[in-house]
Amino acid sequence: MAKVRAALDRITDPSVKAVLNEEAYSHIRPVLRESLTNNPYAIAPDAADTLEKYGIATNPFAVKVHSHGAVKSIENTLLERVGFNLPKEPCIFLFLKRSKLRYLRRGPSNKDIFINLAIEPRDLQRYEEDTLVESWTRITTRYAYISDTLHFFTRKMLADLFFHNPALDVLYATLVLPPEALHKHPSIEPDLYTINYNFNGFQYIPGNHGGGSYSHEFKQLEWLKVGHLKSPELSLTFQMIESIGANHLFMITRGIKITPRVRTFTKDSYVLFPQIFHPRNLNPSKPFPKVKAMQLFTYVKSVKNPTERDIYAKIRQLIKTSELSDYHPDEIVHIVNYFVFISKLDSINSYSDILSLPIWSKALLPIKTKITQLWEKLTGARAFNQLLDALQWKTFTYSLEVVDFSTAPSQRDCFMEDERLETDTLEDEVSQNANNNKPTSLQNIEEAVKNNPDLPWAPWLLILQAHNADCTQKQYDPENNLILPIQEINTLPKHQHPDIPTDLLTLLTKLHREPTTVPLDNHRARAYGSDVKNLRIGALLKKQSKDWLASFALKTENIERQVLMSVIHGAGGSGKSHAIQTWMRSLNRRDRHVTIILPTTDLRNDWTTKVPNLEQANFKTFEKALCQPCGKIIVFDDYSKLPQGYIEAFLAINQNVILAILTGDSKQSFHHESNEDAYTATLEPSINTYQPFCRYYLNITHRNKPDLANKLGVYSCSSGTTSFTMSSQALKGMPILSPSIMKKTALGEMGQKSMTYAGCQGLTTKAVQILLDTNTPLCSSNVIYTALSRAVDHIHFINTGPNSTDFWEKLDSTPYLKTFLDCVREERMNEIVAVEEPPAPVPAPTTHFPKVNPTTVIESYVHDLPEKHGREIFSETHGHSNAIQTDNPVVQLFPHQQAKDETLYWATIEARLQCTSSEENLKEFHLKHDIGDILFLNYKQAMNLPQDPIPFNPDLWTLCKQEIENTYLKKSAAALVNAATRQSPDFDSHAIALFLKSQWVKKTEKIGCLKIKAGQTIAAFMQQTVMIYGTMARYMRKFRNQYCPRKIFVNCETTPADFNSFILDEWNFNRTCFSNDFTAFDQSQDGSILQFEVIKAKFHNIPEDIIEGYIQIKTHAKIFLGTLSIMRLSGEGPTFDANTEANIAYTHTKFNIPCDAAQVYAGDDMSIDYVASVKPSFNMIEHLMKLKGKPVFNTQTQGDFAEFCGWTISPKGIIKKPEKMNMSIELQKNINKFHEVKRSYALDHAFAYQLGDELHELYNESEAEHHQLATRSLILAGQATALDILDYGLRDLK
């Protein structure tokens, strides 16, 4: 597309352009006409952009107003989609007005039938009277459509609709349910609709118009997940056809058909931050936009020592003012703390590189790495590893997995209350989900509920009794919250396999652990296979042959398999594996159909003891299980301790497996891969992968006493109390749990039975000792929970850490420990704590923007710069130019054009000047008379000049002459002496002394330019000539200022304060603005512009001899190369005024500019707050003029404002472009001239500085960075007073 656009830009022939425009219009016109059918409304620009994203066009000329027109256009578009899908035969429409037929593209010939029930009063005026019915009538058509009402139905109502109408095969239905409401999040499309959450429900507000809102219950959101609806009489399949914002179109058909497993509503663009602080509620918990998260991450890592205030300012900069209401203050605090933490971690890889090592060091590097990793386990991870762990962001999604539902009367409340559908209390969630999916009769459950009416889990008592749990009493945690023995309930489909033993299936059904089909994650299996093949993980596996390793990896490369699984989650001591072990004890000794895979040898020994009737070959550690044949039923015990990806890889290579039983605890520790190079180290814990396939979490324990279990938030099924003691000494005969491998190994060497906090998972013992040291606060809550839940009767804490305030405060912040330690903490001696002097108060920063690393900003400009001679202009005669100077990369960004640079001088002459003859110039001048007339007439009208010529005023002429002479005499004596030659009467009045202008090129678009461009010439005329025509220009300027309309601002003899006032008073920021980027403005001012100047001078009655002299100078001007073509030269007296007036004349000749459009002009610079159309007459003369303009449009939104004379025109007033300001300051600092210009820079920068927080609405991120750097440089240079100055015409800030 870029090449096509470039090709079109190169077309300059007006006739060709006219043909192209006509052709384009022929395509645009029918599209605009068609868009009015579904979207006839005048839509706000932001909402129109959102609709366009969904493929809905908005006619920019539409004027029809609607309170929520954008949402109406979505409804109409979905109706069109429905009409496209419906057959031409008659159909029945439910809850739809007959007037909507036009959006369905259907008419009376289709003989459609409308059936509407008056459910609420406004339905009586919404639907036509002849379509209203008292009750449902029979549906006699194959197809029907229900409009925006299905979410108010129950599932049974829908099933009955199909059951009682056998002719109905397909039902199309639209729903209005925002998927983000499942999480109580703000609207994901705020330009279309908003959401309120209150009164135990949510209110959908289209177009922010409360009068058109709809109130919903959270229960209604179930419809977004329905995959199949089953009843004893029939089955229905749901498929989502379209989704636009909160509006969704579903197709419902009879029978069980395939429907996509996942429903996607929007792109995943949010992340969840890892929980790195304890307790968990002190971490960011809400999804955060990933783009903003990456911006914050790169910011805190690009700035040296960013402060808390800097990060707050950065977040304020990134979040639009209109979006601030979507964030909670406490969430912002947690996000800031998260980024403060990672900003202090080192992001430089602290491990050895292999490129600089000799061969013997490379051979020893793996050993060194292993030792280093072991040491890190003992002493804590390095800062680099901590940073990587802290950056494990989890993608947040609004997508949903479909769920199958049943409408049987005994199962009407079996909907899954998962983590995405928030409820007020967990007690409500359990009672709603405590349904009849259990192998018991309704009568038994009703009796259980009757006997225990006040227990939220009463319907689950029989399931709990099957686990030998008598949960008829309420228990509470330390915060007095009710502990629920059943949690995390998921409703899942039930599947069977004919080869599963009947007694095992009966057992699983009794426990409500029926198998369900689980798809294997190919990515996890492939990661594990790659790690095994490349010897990154494992011990036994590394000893396998290369062929075996290659074969193993190949088998895990691409898997498409689903396996029946029974996932059993429960607390430690809940009896997760007890029932399985009981069943296995009934098996024949030689039964090889069952294999138990264990993560540790200790756990394997425990199983062989508890199931002695089976041969030991049935019990395998996980690595041996990969190398040996296994049965068709697999039990993965404590599967969270298995390596990530192991289960998927195992099931991929063992195709004979028909059932996998997984037991684990999501609250306990999980496997951690120590090799960071392993792919599996980046995978999610297996417990998170399979938790959605667990029917419920059994939150009970037979191991721990109530006082211990309740402190852990677990329901205890035992009686008695637990003994807690603490001392600095270990007791004999009790295993010790230590937080680090180092302590565990040392204790083992001394003959003491010891395990780590994480490694004790699966252990059950009468008494246990828990070692507390400086590593304890570093342990995760899962690890602490594992350690605390091991003991039956007694826990002894061994405090080997410092007995100081800081140490105890750290332990208090560790989840679970604080509750226990309060019971047993020893009396501490009063400590004398030295009172530190309070730090000196830090003065509040003047700027509201976050700190920026200047090196990073500069680097973005210099890193792509080629070497000096690759950028310079080369001439075979004079060699390379010398515009790139010094070795300073900052200075090299700015070309320095110097008068003594011969190569640049000749390159400038070649690019800027064109020689001809005086005869050709006169011919050009006379041939362009008509165009000059047109230019002047348009200029006259634009500048409101009188109808009759302006009489000549000799006194005013004399005054202007004096002003010119006084200005000239203010030059230094040296400057006057240097110009002595041009003051001589012998100097040829037509001759021009040509010089190259010395200057630093600081235009924003030319900073760091890859190739040096031609410079600018200074044309030195005879001094008398300059004085005469400078007087003429000043004389006409006086009249121009007198007649200038209020809406036109000419930036001549004005101050920035004048310009600022004009912008604040006159400029319209509610529409796109327009600028004209002229090409070769000076060189293109040919005979037509000269004619315009002559006619303008005659209108002001300038004496004829002066006008004739001016024509002679313009047509006979000569340099040492010959006579110049008619053009504008920089050394003329009237250069600025003539350029400005030519700009105004050309702009008003080309464009239809309304009188209420604000306009600013200065030389070749201009801008208008209105996008004007081209006059038809201009197409007739455009080819006769050299002057060409390229339009530039600005939306006048954040980061896209018009620029004029180095100022940015913003809704808050004029401000200097921060990029140019900052880079100019950097240049001046690097050439040691900053002290000369700092005050003038500060006065210009003050316009932006004093806007304060309002700048967040104007600057994008890059501009904000440059603004902060410029502000800091000026303040450090002692210009704070200049930035705060109030009498500079900005505003009254007092």
From Swiss-Prot:
Mention one GO molecular function: RNA-directed RNA polymerase activity
Catalysis: reaction(s): RNA(n) + a ribonucleoside 5'-triphosphate = RNA(n+1) + diphosphate; ATP + H2O = ADP + phosphate + H(+)
Residues in domain (+)RNA virus helicase C-terminal? 699-832
| Domain (+)RNA virus helicase ATP-binding: residue ranges | 541-698
Question: What positions does the domain Alphavirus-like MT occupy?
Answer: 59-224
Q: What does this protein do?
A: RNA replication. The central part of this protein possibly functions as an ATP-binding helicase.
Name listed for the protein in its UniProt record: RNA replication protein
InterPro entries the record matches: (+)RNA_virus_helicase_core_dom (IPR027351), Alphavirus-like_MT_dom (IPR002588), DNA/RNA_pol_sf (IPR043502), P-loop_NTPase (IPR027417), RNA-dep_RNA_pol_alsuvir (IPR001788), RNA-dir_pol_PSvirus (IPR007094)
Q: EC number(s) on record?
A: 2.7.7.48, 3.6.4.13
Q: Which organism is it from?
A: White clover mosaic virus (strain M)
Stretches assigned to the RdRp catalytic domain: 1071-1178
Locate the residues binding ATP: 570-577
The record's keywords, sorted A to Z, are: ATP-binding, Helicase, Hydrolase, Multifunctional enzyme, Nucleotide-binding, Nucleotidyltransferase, RNA-directed RNA polymerase, Transferase, Viral RNA replication
UniProt record similarity statement: Belongs to the potexvirus/carlavirus RNA replication protein family.
Instruction: State any GO BP term from the record.
Output: viral RNA genome replication
